[in-house]
Curated annotation (Swiss-Prot):
Keyword Nucleotide-binding found: yes
Record's catalysed reaction(s): tRNA(Leu) + L-leucine + ATP = L-leucyl-tRNA(Leu) + AMP + diphosphate
GO CC entries: cytosol
Motif extent ('KMSKS' region): 624-628
GO terms classed as biological process: leucyl-tRNA aminoacylation
Matches recorded under NCBIfam families: leuS_bact
Gene3D superfamilies: 2.20.28.290, 3.10.20.590, HUPs (3.40.50.620), Isoleucyl-tRNA Synthetase, Domain 1 (1.10.730.10)
The family this protein is said to belong to: Belongs to the class-I aminoacyl-tRNA synthetase family.
Top-rank taxon, per record: Bacteria
Organism taxonomic ancestry: Bacteria, Pseudomonadati, Pseudomonadota, Betaproteobacteria, Burkholderiales
Places the protein is found: Cytoplasm
Name this polypeptide is given: Leucine--tRNA ligase
EC numbers on record: 6.1.1.4
UniProt-annotated binding residues for ATP: 627
Length: 864
């Protein structure tokens, strides 16, 4: 072996052995417990970032540790390969999205392989391949048969210049991101999946999951089960009687209603706008806004009075109807009751437009004011009804019951459970996605593609130009025959939401070569024992994948109803930011690698200059690594300079997996230095470490016993930390081990070999290359087999036994020394040894002991 640690050589050698042995190809094995661990599959954007490195290293460490502990472990990988970024890149570069995607996959796969990840590449999938998305289409048709998939009109963002539908993130300040045109809302037919049919189960099954509480709460809030009252305000228009329906969780405030607001798309708004240009103009303005709930939450709340009133169902008083830009047709009934006295948004709206504000609940001892909103105005915990006639004095629950009963008696409504969750719209008016398997026949209508004709293959040679969906212009794709009548027909040009692709890929990993969607192997591996990904996926991806899994179960495809038993949401990777700001306020961000930082005597940054010109830059603080802030670290540069093991070691040591990781160049250098020490010890002591002589543990000398005691004590802690996924303290334990071994004076070669072998196995899951090569070079592989399959070291409990123990010696409560006594010494023997110790003679001033306090195994305190 080389004297010097050369990461590139070490890692190339280890990876060569792993490839030759096909070391990570995994098969089902009923004789072993299984452990299926999956990192959320990446989008092939071009290059890995440090967030990827951290995620996959966590997965890899888990895999290797559990494989050493006898588990049949599986770590697969794939590519979430459809999506809008590929179309954008295609437009920018004039190449088909397919070429851009496959080139990126090739590069990123090479990066993963250079990290030494234990991936079974025989299971690799790419969601843009027909053999994968065929099953998206197949299950969609099954859901169509069962009524889970259905078609209805939905609202989208329409760019009138580019003549295309825009995703919410492509609408910037109400304008199309490419054309700059004012975006319009349009109603178009789309396909939906009835996720609401599973709302109760999705909510209730959260209790049995080993997921972070934060994620569970986010899903609970998104599902949003609400108990309230659905009722209507009666009105008459053009001789027709009807109800303007609303849903409220605050029926106790119903007598505080001073207006109603409806969405711009509400049928009543459409009717009232006829012949009224000012109303129609406002409706058109609303339709130009984004359709995302987040957009509505942050936009300025605007409204216009219709001049029309409905009647209050309990008092008969007129209630003015407004059209509001903050009311979404897709949520609730598309109408809301306005109670400005007890709702902050309604309060602001009423103040803006001079609408009446009525107080109908009050808390004792609190004064109501119209000057500004106060949090307690909507309090339902302590408030009671006031100014509400027969309901006065009732608390929230009793008031809701009474109001609901009266509304029901009048035929206006009743109690209702509602959900914030809405059915999942899966139609996307985009090219680079799974084609929806529907054919439009002029005679037969919408006809599902027959199962034997799947997949409907997406042409991969089209180049989007931003003016509509390329599929609509592709005669070869578009034109077909109706499966029912044989007449000329057209294919559906919408593609599926890319969340469909990522809703079941983990099941396909288990049977990637199956000629069915899944097979018996899926029930062996699934559900995932551990899923790893960012908190940003807490709602949509994780909720949709839970729904998709339940549908697959109900169709008899699988036996499980949840995709993942446990979830780990790794923390973000942070780094320093630096910028300069020009006269217009525009900021230019500089990568930390291009900046020199000065620090004060306490190590705090106090200034920074750009390396190219020596001029100052502003310290922008520590933020998440991102392209926008130019504060990322290229993993490939790191691997090329220090090696993959250093990158892995630093990302595991710098912080616990679930916490944020702050990047540190000094920390990376420290990780590299530690690995050089591990290697150097092995190289320097290779003759001693190659000694295979056995030993009698009972006959060992003090130095050997002390070293073994230290190593096995630390091993016990490291094992515990591996089990609780605290890999940072595992690395700390390994550092303690190396210090103990390196500093052991008088230890015999046989014990050095034993303890160094323990160190290599403890470190192996984190830094597999250097430990694998040392294990082989020092002869451990000849004795125990390759480190890949070496068993996890067992703690020698006998080595932890001590003939003597050390107690703290105190005199009058102050530490004055240490006292060594036999482990099984009696209290009397301990007291005698304490008063005989020279420390007592020195600090007692010749006074006799009045009292001796013995805390077994810890200390002796002599009171004089």
């Amino acid at each position: 072996m080389h004297e010097r640690y050369v990461p590139a050589d070490v890692e190339a050698a280890a990876q060569g052995d792993w490839r030759a042995a096909d070391a990570y190809k995994t098969r089902e094995d009923s004789q072993k417990p299984k452990f299926y661990c999956v990192s959320m599959l990446p989008y092939p954007s071009g290059k890995l970032h440090m967030g990827h490195v951290r995620n996959y290293t966590i997965n890899d460490v888990m895999y290797r540790y559990l494989r050493m502990n006898g588990y049949n472990t599986l770590m697969p990988m794939g590519w979430d390969a459809f999506g809008m970024p590929a179309e954008n890149a295609a437009m920018a570069n004039g190449v088909p999205p397919a070429k851009w995607t496959y080139d990126n996959i090739d590069y990123m796969k090479g990066q993963m392989q250079s990290m030494g990840l234990a991936i079974d590449w025989s299971r690799e999938i790419a969601t843009c391949k027909p053999d994968y998305y065929k099953w998206n289409q197949w299950l969609f048709l099954k859901m169509l048969e069962k009524g889970i998939a259905y078609k209805k009109t939905g609202t989208v963002n329409w760019d009138p210049v580019d003549q295309t539908v825009l995703a919410n993130e492509q609408v910037i300040d109400g304008r199309g991101w490419r054309s700059g045109a004012l975006v319009e809302k349009r109603e178009i037919p789309m396909y939906y999946l009835r996720i609401t049919q599973y709302a109760d189960e999705l909510l209730n099954d959260l209790d049995g999951l080993g997921w972070p509480e934060r994620v569970k709460i986010m899903q609970q809030n998104w599902i949003g089960k609400s108990f309230g009252v659905n009722f209507g305000f009666p009105y008459e228009l053009d001789g027709e009687k009807a109800l303007l329906r609303v849903f409220t969780t605050r029926a106790d405030t119903i007598l505080g209603v001073t207006f109603c607001a409806v969405a711009a798309e509400h049928p009543l708004a459409t009717r009232l706008a006829q012949g009224k240009p000012e109303l129609q103009a406002f409706i058109d303005e609303c339709k130009r806004g984004g359709v995302a709930e987040a957009d509505v939450a942050t936009m300025e709340k605007k409204g216009v009075a219709t001049g029309f009133s409905v009647s209050h169902p309990l008092t008969g008083e007129p209630v003015e109807v407004w059209i509001g830009n903050y009311v979404l047709m897709s949520y609730g009934e598309g109408a809301v009751m306005g109670v400005p006295g007890h709702d902050e948004r309604d309060f602001a709206f009423a103040k803006k437009y001079g609408l009446p504000i009525k107080q109908v609940i009050a808390s004792e001892g609190q004064t109501y004011s119209l000057d500004a909103w106060q949090e307690w105005y909507g309090d339902k915990e302590t408030a009671v009804c006031v100014n509400s006639g027969k309901y006065d004095g009732l608390r929230y629950a009793d008031a809701v019951d009474a109001v609901a009963a009266d509304l029901k008696a009048g035929g206006y409504g009743d109690k209702q459970v509602t959900w914030r969750l809405r059915d999942w719209g899966v139609s996307r008016q985009r090219y680079w996605g799974t084609p929806i398997p529907i054919i439009h026949c002029p005679s037969c209508g919408d006809v599902p593609v027959p199962e034997q004709d799947l997949p409907v293959v997406l042409p991969e040679d089209l180049v989007p130009d931003g003016s509509g969906n390329p599929l609509a212009k592709s005669e070869a794709f578009l034109n077909c025959s109706c499966p029912k009548c044989g007449a000329a027909a057209k294919r559906e040009t919408d593609t599926m939401d890319t969340f469909v692709d990522s809703s079941w890929y983990f099941s396909r990993y288990t049977a990637p070569d199956a000629d069915t969607m899944v097979d018996a192997r899926t029930d062996y591996w699934m559900p995932m024992d551990q899923y790893i990904g960012g908190i940003e996926h807490a709602i949509l991806h994780l909720l949709y994948s839970r729904f998709w899994t339940k549908v697959m179960r109900d169709l008899g495809l699988v036996k499980f109803g949840e995709p993942a038993k446990n979830l780990l949401t790794q923390g973000m990777v942070l780094n320093e930011t630096f910028y300069r700001e020009d006269a217009s306020g525009k900021k230019t961000w500089y990568n930390p690698a291009d900046v020199t930082v000065t620090h004060d005597d306490k190590g705090r940054p106090v200034g920074a200059t750009l390396n190219t010109d020596g001029q100052p830059v502003v310290l922008g603080g520590i933020e998440k690594m991102s392209k926008s802030k130019n504060n990322g670290v290229d993993p490939q540069v790191l691997i090329d300079q220090y090696g993959a093991d250093t990158a892995r070691l630093f990302t595991m040591f710098a912080a616990p997996p679930e916490q944020q990781l702050e990047w540190s160049g000094a920390g990376v250098e420290g990780a590299s230095r530690f690995l050089r020490r591990v290697w150097s010890f092995g190289a320097t002591n290779r003759e001693a470490l190659a000694t295979r002589a056995g030993f009698d543990a009972a006959a060992l000398g003090d130095a050997d016993k002390a070293l073994r005691r230290e190593i096995y004590s630390v091993l016990k802690q490291a094992d515990f930390d591996y089990q609780r996924l605290q890999y940072n303290t595992v690395v700390s334990a390994a550092m303690k081990m190396l210090n103990a071994i390196d500093g052991a004076k008088g230890a015999t070669p046989a014990v050095l070999r034993e303890t160094y072998g323990v160190l290599l196995r403890v470190l192996y899951p984190v830094v597999p290359h250097v430990t694998f090569e040392l294990w082989k070079a020092l002869g451990y592989a000849d004795e125990f087999g390759p480190l890949l399959d070496a068993p996890w070291p067992k703690v020698d409990e006998a080595a932890l036994e001590q003939a003597e123990i050390e107690l703290v010696l105190q005199v009058n409560g102050k530490v004055r020394g240490a006292l060594k006594v036999a482990k099984d010494a009696s209290r009397e023997a301990i007291e005698a040894a304490a008063v005989a110790d020279e420390a007592f003679a020195k600090f007692s001033d010749g006074k006799p002991a009045k009292k001796i306090v013995v805390v077994p195994g810890r200390l002796v305190n002599i009171v004089v």
